[in-house]
Amino acid sequence: MKLKINNVRISLRQEQTLEQAVCRKCGIPREALGSVRIVRKAVDARKKNDICLNYHVLAEVETGGRQAKRLLADRDITQYQEQQQPTLELGTLPLSAPPVVIGAGPAGLLAALQRAEHGYKPLLLERGKPVAQRVQDVQRFWQTGEFNPASNVQFGEGGAGTFSDGKLTTRVNDPMMAEILQLFVDAGAPENILYEHKPHVGTDKLRAMVQGLSRRIAELGGSVRYDAHVVDLDIKNNAVQGVILDGGERLAAGAVVLACGHSARDTYAMLARRGVGIVAKPFAIGVRIEHPQELIDRAQYGSFAGHHLLGAADYALVYHTQDKTRTAYSFCMCPGGQVVAAASEAGGVVVNGMSMFKRDSGIANSALVVNVDSRDFGDGALAGVEFQRRYEQLAYAAAGSSYYAPAQDLDSFLKRSTPSLECLVQPSYRPGLTACSLDKVLPAYVTDTLREGITSFGRKLAGYADGGALLTGVETRTSAPVRIERDRQSYVSLTHDLLYPCGEGAGYAGGIMSAALDGYHVARAIMERFAPVK
């Protein structure tokens, strides 16, 4: 009998195999247990003196009669049944030309891959470079300050997530998540992402995975073009007929998936100019904070810090002001990672976080950000974009106009005293830092809320608010500052037919998995409407 067995717990105080723990949970001898497959694995650190690994598994168990009845009486044990995948009925309307996807981030890659698998021969257009060239350009920027507006942390194969921690978590509960994770594994991601409660691939594994997805699209009859910057849409009778590239080349398109990413500000401006439905939306801005990873490990795991089965600890922290108008929270926490320069425009400083798969840098970093909305940046579809740009340019100027970032030790920030770079970590941001009061590069309502929030976080995580941490600014690209309006069922733009806004850049996702899922659903919507390309 194949059983789904939840909450199989193994204490780190014990030396026990997973098979032994399953047998103990079920009350069966070892010889009655067949194959075991992990469905989910999580760390339960609620009791610092007895941290456990908690597994959900699928197991083949030789049982029947009374024993089977006894097992199934346990609320953690059920008889396993294969989940039925939703069927896809392909549409019948003919496409006037192959579909085009703008942007090779997670949303664009999945939108293209899904249609390639069903014979739609999509054309994927990426404004930046392939991963290998992009990595060289980014490394040059970090080492020398030589900025390339066409190839950077935001633009290029894989999107902004290529230089991140590679988190594959999401709050969206969708049965297609498992299928997407399997696609990632098939493309080169490690298999443990299929069951880890907090899966991540790291920037190093993610780069290989992205290349695998692009290759698969080409193998299935699609095509990928780099250095293909879409600067305009070919619109007739409020329907998109094609796209126009930088340089004037026109490409016909039977449908256009717009997965441009959250930093494609020139694309946003073009859409607004062309009358495409686009509105401002709230987002958040702030700083990156760096602590010794050992401090976070001790705060989260106590005496088990450093245990080989735990890895580098993460955290998620939230603080609401007394009047409930502002929230400070950690975002995109990168255990064992580094702070990176993430500008996409000349003359602006942007910071982000990144980790390798092993998360072994010895430094924990996270964004600490505060919510902003129209009361802060005003009216207008692109008001949020201008708000971001203003503080990025302030940071650039304050740090010496060289892509150095303004930074301040936590103690001086909390005390509003003379800023310094003295801290307990070796600062990881490159090309370098300039000691600067962060009050000069962020609005007062952000820095004031951060001070309150960090003080609160220190009561939740031991040592968090003590001296020794470093703050680096500015973090402005937490999510898209706009939403490109679309129909909830058909995914089509509310103003222009055959245009399908998609992913994080369109305001419908926040992270690799939710963006990939949105690309998946947009692709299905197009396939349910149109027939494959002949």
Where are these regions (language model features)?
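Residues forming the flavin
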Residues: 1-51, 57-163, 167-187, 191-534
